């Protein structure tokens, strides 16, 4: 996969793309990252990328020309059209399902806005508009980092154990079960006996119940579109009966 980021602040991505899972994915050749300062594509003497809004109002608007030219340069040799993602608070809220969808692509281009955002005509380039929450950030850079991380970790070979991505919270439609490691007793807080039993069927049942319990208690909205198995339905009924 190739990921390009159009931004006025490329240095913001150095630590993120050069650390942890994203760096490992890059080192393995699974993904390549490129940050592009779209100021370099501004067709004016002073490399100006913004201007006053027509009709008046506060703030400055990012001009379309540098973005169009930068995207053109990034896609001129491509055989397949990339997904061009604008980060903006008006966009579709990012989700695990969206991350899985984007992980199937060969090329992603992130457009990171600033100031009052992009000139509306930039949307003619865009395939997706994404947000990471109902709040406003200074720019799209942090959102691009979040989405890139959520996508890359789903690529085959990125995680040490591919099952890790499958069992993460939201991947199954539910919140993940609790995790424990050594010691078995830490300051009087003990690991549940079932996890020490070595009985794999009972452990899986415990994890299933804990996952359903957490989802019911913390994110019951996730259960609205969830289709439980017969066993999960029985556990859910028992948990809901206890709540009444």
Curated annotation (Swiss-Prot):
It catalyses: guanosine(37) in tRNA + S-adenosyl-L-methionine = N(1)-methylguanosine(37) in tRNA + S-adenosyl-L-homocysteine + H(+). It comes from Shouchella clausii (strain KSM-K16) (Alkalihalobacillus clausii). Homodimer. CDD domains: TrmD-like (cd18080). Keywords: Cytoplasm, Methyltransferase, S-adenosyl-L-methionine, Transferase, tRNA processing. It is an enzyme of class 2 (transferase). Its main location: cytoplasm. S-adenosyl-L-methionine binds at residues 113, 132-137. The keyword Zinc does not apply. It holds the Pfam family tRNA_m1G_MT. Transmembrane segments: none annotated. GO terms for biological process: tRNA N1-guanine methylation. NCBIfam families: PRK00026.1, trmD. It is found in: Cytoplasm. Belongs to the RNA methyltransferase TrmD family. Specifically methylates guanosine-37 in various tRNAs. One of its GO terms (molecular function) is tRNA (guanine(37)-N1)-methyltransferase activity. One of its GO terms (cellular component) is cytosol. HAMAP family: TrmD. InterPro entries: Alpha/beta_knot_MTases, tRNA_m1G_MeTrfase_C_sf, tRNA_m1G_MeTrfase_TrmD, tRNA_m1G_MTases_N, tRNA_MeTrfase_TRMD/TRM10. The keyword tRNA processing applies. This is tRNA (guanine-N(1)-)-methyltransferase. Its EC number is 2.1.1.228.
